[in-house]
Amino acid sequence: MKARSVVTLSDVAERAGVSLATASRVINGGTRAVSPHYRDRVLAAASDLGYTPNAHAQAMARGRSKMIGLVVHDIADPYFSAIAAGAISLAGSRGLLVLGNTLHNPDYEFEYVSTMRAQRAQALILVGSRTTDVEHTRRLTDEVAEFIEGGGRVAAVSQDTLGADTVLPENRAGAHALAAALITEGHRRFAVLGGPKTLLTARDRVEGFQDALAEQGLEPPVVIEGAFTRDGGYTAMCGLLDLPDHPPCVFAVNDVMAIGAMAAVRERGLRVPGDVAVAGFDDIPTLRDVAPTLTTVRLPLAEMGRLAASMVLDDEPRTTPRVAPIAGEVVLRESTIR
């Protein structure tokens, strides 16, 4: 059987009886108007022939493509995937193509922004964690500035140092409120599974928790660093349980670390919360399957993604970046009941 040939824009123009330039203006959205009569003829011809538009040609004709680049550190992490889902739900409703993601690799982050700029993407949404790496932040800020100068829109979640619109969770205040709630519940000795010191999100949560204990005249928590992952929480908790007379109430700075920490407690033949109370942060969707139910600080993750998407999709002119603070809500559950 003879292979079907690829339908070109020239084929569409010939079928419609118009010039190639006219067909291009209809299909690719050029700046010059086309009369309804010829527009209908071109669209009918394209439909009859099964023509698929060239996305790059459309971007060149319009000055911007319909793409939104979605840069996510780890799409497998429920925190990032929930935010991404919110962004995608809004962008998809606008008929826009949303692309993902990076893999915790700063070099991929730069390459992704650069590629989206070269592809004339309409917008970028950056969903990542702030870092203490000054050089990384400088390079990413420069890439973002070039993207914006080229006419693109950028919004970030958590990263408030990039010169872009930002959805900013109040990590320090949320951890402070959690500590205060746990103290009210009768807890007095604490440990914190703190995540890497290079992540400012983790650092803010640790410091907010520490501040609340200090305000109540309690001993500083034992802080153990670990990867910002389930396995990081598991390993950090194992280290804590090896300490003599370890604190009986543990705050893991995100929920996936808390889930790993609870697994470590169970493996030692101990009970949550009977022997060790555990709390997390974020209220990721998968917590509905965790037993006992996990005390945490709830962030509206999907709404944060939608808000970031709305920031890059609106047409309001502005000269300074906007910052939308997002408050956390303490949710007390079974894992910290005394």
Language-model regions, residue ranges each:
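Short histidine/acidic/glycine/proline-rich micro-motifs that form metal-
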Residues: 28-29, 74, 103-104, 130-134, ...
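Bacterial carbohydrate/catabolite-sensing allosteric modules
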Residues: 1-2, 48, 89-94, 134, ...
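Amphipathic helical "hinge" segments at domain boundaries
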Residues: 36-40, 49-123, 130, 207-210
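Short beta-strand segments enriched in small/hydrophobic residues
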Residues: 22-24, 62-74, 181, 189-195
